[in-house]
Amino acid sequence: MEHSFWHSKWQKNEIGFHEPEGNALLIKYASSLLDVENSHSALKRIFVPLCGKTRDIGWLLSQGCEVVGAELSEVAIIQLFEELGAEPTITPTAKGKVYAKDGLTIHVGDIFKLTSSDIGDVTGVYDRAALVALPSPLREQYAAHLITITQCAPQLIISFEYDQNEMAGPPFSVNEKTVDALYSADYNIQRLERSVLEGGLKGKVDADNLVFALKAK
């Protein structure tokens, strides 16, 4: 991963992609994650890759979920806990640091170094910021790694589709064909929504929202 890019974004507070409230599409389609039958536990434990300081985490916690996140930028995670009003326990590890408090655990470091034992059992994956943050060469590696460390847990993916020639990204355009190519060997994929992104992406380019539910085959 290009570590310096994301560290710089957070240090300079250049985080226009960060929404002040929980994402409306998460709230609309959360049942695809939270209503999944799980024989191991009634508790919903959701993995949020490349989570940043998204307030979606607070919303998931408010629904009674435990949340496990992975994020490269420690600045983002410090801000996340401050905004949640929570004082985390911070544990250094060989792979970075773990911030934890009241059902929320964030692994600060390179997501590609995490294993299934690091994150523990999860009942679902919420990906609103990972696929669209990664350039094309890294997406295949990311998808394969995510399948491994989450043991093919169900996913809710929110992405954008737009003309990549009009804006370089990130966030990058990730269309339905790309999601199918990355995940169709392991998951049944259902597109839940395609809708126009009001105001465009960052106000610069026309774009559509795409929402997918993935269930293991």
Place the predicted regions along the sequence by residue.
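Gly/Ala-rich phosphate-binding loop of Rossmann-like dinucleotide-binding domains
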Residues: 61-62
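Generic beta-sheet signal
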Residues: 44-46, 123
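Class I SAM-dependent methyltransferase "Motif I" SAM/SAH-binding loop
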Residues: 47-54, 130
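Class I (Rossmann-like) S-adenosyl-L-methionine-dependent methyltransferase catalytic domain
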Residues: 1-44, 53-57, 69-104, 108-118, ...
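Conserved acetyl-CoA-binding loop of GNAT-fold acetyltransferases
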Residues: 65
